């Protein structure tokens, strides 16, 4: 109990409630939220999340149409101790009606309590219609579908400078082989083809986990990737060691990156700052990296910096995409909860939330029913094109889905030693495998 109280007292918590708008606001409901919702006035659904203001307010604003059209109020509570508090609340009989869960592993943990409930039929139908099987799979536990996806983020991008490419006469590569032909040209011109930095304080090493993940899914596909997360395929498996060799030929090749050891001490946020001036030419990093460039940087297709899709390696793996996101998991079967679940799995919800993000954007959905034109930020359009591709091979960040002792522990430290100390692939793989928690 003292531990629980301790967690609660340091938690930053914000609670907000949607209010019912005047009846006139509900006149266009079929367009605003879609048809077929029950009128359930004076009902309230509680939602618990790690999202805090200002983003929490944007969620509340995006839900106003739903409340106006159904009468169902939504009370959202955000906490920076969400991942610690949710299991405590669920096991203690104080579960929220809906939780926005950021990791598939936490969803599985909640299902194991017996308190999470499978998604209603209409939600399942929406997810089947609008999301790729990969996305649906991450909301599924023990062959039962529980949680519709919420937002999405895109990792499979390579940052570059359109201005520097134009100046040098380079074309954006559209295949893995083309990217390395281009890197060879850059090396011949005495340019640093790839920037790199895996420094991140106590989380140093995480960018290297992303590079390995990008290669594993591209070389060996989603099945091997999933088996790697569960440790059916070990790090010492020939496939994973082959993927590590591919990463080494890419990001540990002095011809392409210069000083390999410097990658271990360069902060990830600083790694690509030389791209606008041509100090280095390409950086594999997620869509959020745009925020690292200083004010005044032209982030556009013909500007100082832009990004292209990191191409596949194995033609049998269709459009590999690594990303992340959150999922709506319910702990109640009350009609008002299911109505909200249904709405949160529609393009109408995604469009409402995108609109509240404003012209700067930054909120993405992998819902294929959302037109790319809904995004006002061109970078969001680029990311959403791949995230919402129903034929893509989508995978979730593997280190986030592995046991924390590995994915946020030994994998970080061992991959850092790989870069900083030249530790062998075999020794790195063995050390990570040996650290895997016993079942």
Regions found by a protein language model. Name each.
Residues 1-24:
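Secretory targeting and sorting signals
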Residues 23-108, 122, 427, 434-439:
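Conserved N-terminal structural module of periplasmic/extracytoplasmic solute-binding proteins
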Residues 28-39, 104-156, 207:
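Hinge/lid segment of periplasmic solute-binding proteins
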Residues 36-39, 120-131, 198-202, 218-242, ...:
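Short, solvent-exposed loop/beta-turn-alpha elements that line the ligand-binding surface or hinge
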Residues 146-150, 180-233:
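Extracytoplasmic/periplasmic solute-binding protein
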Residues 229-261:
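Glycine-centered hinge/linker elements that transmit conformational signals in sensory
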Residues 295-361:
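Extracytoplasmic/periplasmic substrate-recognition and gating elements
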Residues 365, 380-436:
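C-terminal capping/gating helix-and-loop segments adjacent to ligand/active sites or protein-protein/ligand interfaces
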């Amino acid at each position: 109990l003292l531990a629980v109280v301790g967690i609660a007292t340091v938690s930053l918590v914000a609670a907000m409630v949607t209010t019912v708008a005047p009846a006139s606001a509900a006149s266009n409901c079929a367009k605003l939220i879609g048809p077929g919702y029950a009128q359930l006035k004076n009902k309230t659904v509680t939602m618990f999340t790690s999202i805090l203001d200002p983003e929490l307010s944007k969620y509340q604003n995006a839900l106003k149409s739903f409340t106006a059209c159904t009468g169902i109020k939504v009370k959202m509570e955000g906490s920076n101790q969400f991942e610690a508090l949710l299991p405590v609340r669920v096991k203690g009989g104080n579960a929220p009606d809906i939780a926005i869960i950021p990791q598939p592993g936490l969803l599985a943990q909640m299902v194991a309590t017996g308190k999470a409930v499978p998604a209603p039929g209409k939600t399942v139908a929406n997810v089947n219609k609008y999301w790729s099987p990969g996305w649906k799979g991450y909301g599924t536990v023990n062959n039962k579908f529980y949680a519709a996806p919420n937002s999405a983020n895109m990792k499979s991008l390579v940052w570059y400078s359109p201005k520097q490419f134009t100046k040098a006469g380079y074309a954006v590569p559209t295949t893995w082989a083309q990217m390395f032909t281009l890197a060879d040209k850059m090396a011949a011109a005495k340019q640093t083809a790839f920037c790199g930095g895996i420094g991140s304080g106590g989380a140093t090493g995480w960018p290297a986990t992303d590079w390995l993940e990008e290669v594993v899914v591209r070389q060996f596909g989603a099945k091997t990737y999933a088996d790697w997360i569960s440790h059916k395929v070990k790090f010492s498996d020939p496939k994973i060691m082959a993927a590590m060799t591919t990463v080494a030929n890419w990001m540990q090749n002095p011809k392409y990156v210069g000083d390999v050891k410097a990658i271990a001490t360069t902060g990830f946020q600083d790694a690509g700052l030389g791209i606008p001036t041509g100090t280095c030419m390409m950086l594999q990093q997620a869509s959020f990296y745009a925020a690292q460039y200083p004010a005044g940087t032209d982030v556009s297709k013909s500007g100082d910096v832009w990004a292209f899709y990191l191409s596949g390696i194995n033609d049998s793996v269709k459009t590999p995409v690594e990303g992340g996101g959150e999922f709506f998991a319910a702990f109640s079967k009350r009609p008002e909860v299911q109505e909200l679940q249904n709405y949160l799995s529609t393009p109408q919800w995604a469009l409402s939330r995108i609109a509240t993000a404003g012209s700067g954007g930054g909120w993405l959905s992998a819902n294929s029913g959302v037109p790319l034109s809904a995004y006002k930020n061109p970078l969001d359009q680029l990311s959403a094109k791949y995230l919402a591709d129903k034929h893509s091979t989508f995978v979730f960040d593997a280190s986030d889905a592995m046991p924390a002792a590995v994915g946020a522990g030994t994998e970080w430290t061992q991959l850092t030693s790989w870069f900083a100390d030249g530790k062998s692939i075999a020794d790195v793989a063995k050390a990570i495998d040996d650290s895997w928690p016993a079942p």
